[in-house]
């Protein structure tokens, strides 16, 4: 898929995910963990992309093997960030990561997050983390 077509598809998917979460009652003001999914059949390439993402300030999960429907195996990692559930912020991260992984022939497989209950008791309300209104989504 061409670069611009992939980004446009991801922008549409981002808006759909956000819309569905909010329609289901997820807290619009919560701090969300965004999990960007990467995969590759070459571990070394995936590792290089993961290291570059880490250098940009993202958290990176341990690599895992995943068997696909056709029986082939790929290696996967999640690239994590925290922020507001705002399409523009997520779009910026997606574009940054798609550009990054293209250098290593790694697949960007989309992103996801979790429902945030607006009525849940927050055990770590005093942890000092707040949504940064000036965050443009891009990590440095």
UniProtKB/Swiss-Prot annotation:
Keywords: Cytoplasm. GO terms for cellular component: cytoplasm. Pfam families: RraB. Residues 119-140 have a biased composition (Acidic residues). Residues 115-140 are annotated as: Disordered. SUPFAM superfamilies: Hypothetical protein VC0424. It is found in: Cytoplasm. GO terms for molecular function: endoribonuclease inhibitor activity; enzyme binding. Interacts with the C-terminal region of Rne. Belongs to the RraB family. Globally modulates RNA abundance by binding to RNase E (Rne) and regulating its endonucleolytic activity. Can modulate Rne action in a substrate-dependent manner by altering the composition of the degradosome. This is Regulator of ribonuclease activity B. It comes from Pantoea ananatis (strain LMG 20103). The lineage of its organism: Bacteria, Pseudomonadati, Pseudomonadota, Gammaproteobacteria, Enterobacterales. The gene is rraB.
């Amino acid at each position: 898929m061409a670069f611009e077509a992939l980004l446009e598809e991801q922008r549409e998917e981002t808006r759909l995910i956000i819309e569905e979460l909010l329609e289901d009652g997820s807290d619009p003001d919560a701090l969300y963990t965004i999990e960007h999914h990467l995969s590759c059949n070459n571990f070394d390439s995936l590792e290089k992309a993961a290291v570059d993402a880490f250098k940009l300030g993202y958290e990176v999960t341990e690599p895992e093997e995943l068997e696909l429907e056709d029986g082939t195996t790929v290696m996967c990692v999640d690239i994590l960030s925290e922020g507001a559930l705002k399409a523009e912020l997520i779009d910026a991260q997606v574009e940054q990561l798609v550009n990054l992984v293209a250098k290593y022939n790694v697949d960007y497989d989309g992103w996801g997050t979790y429902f945030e209950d607006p009525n849940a008791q927050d055990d770590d309300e005093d942890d000092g983390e707040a949504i940064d209104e000036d965050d443009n989504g891009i990590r440095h």
